[in-house]
């Protein structure tokens, strides 16, 4: 996280930006769940805060990541849960139509619903949730693994080369496009190891047009070496808000 913050600061000096989103593993750390943290980064944790405080070991990691800590406050203020750039929505696992419907009673338009999602997660990270409604939606956004924008696997499991009008795409992707008036969805979360190990891919195509959904978790981490030892570096390039291109490095 520190690295990406540094990259954003450097990019900003040249008219660019590096936008970072929150994912389920950042939230797990804030919940005190370190199941997927390596032994080294848990037991030998070592962090010097900008204010001069030193945090070490497992207890140090717990204190650094607890809601309301200085580190998590920075995380809350520098990262969103969902981001729309142009006509493309970016989020970790995907905002499902069923989640949008659960926000209907708030009487918010589609953009305000996304702002509300960002606000509730941010308030939780800042340790500033207040009232029953905040707690209710915090549980929905963060803990409900079936529909949470950090946890659901719906978008990640749709097969390649699936039409936008198929049941799988229509009931999740197309309805989300309609509700939020967007053109494309980009998600991570579910490693794309089932697509002939091709990594980043798109699906939910519309006749005469490109794919409406892109999945960009190619299983690039070393933890997936057992499944794909020859994985390559990939990026999804988006130009002029309409041209999507998957760039893949040459295999060794």
From Swiss-Prot:
Q: Does the keyword Transmembrane apply?
A: yes
Where is this gene product found? Answer: Host membrane; Virion
**Gene3D superfamilies given for it?**
3.60.21.10
Name any GO cellular component annotation: host cell membrane
Extract the InterPro entries matched here.
Metallo-depent_PP-like (IPR029052)
Could you identify this protein by its name?
Answer: Uncharacterized protein R398
Which keywords does this Swiss-Prot/TrEMBL entry list?
A: Host membrane, Membrane, Transmembrane, Transmembrane helix, Virion
Main subcellular localisation: host cell
Q: Transmembrane region positions?
A: 80-100
Membrane topology according to the record:
Single-pass membrane protein
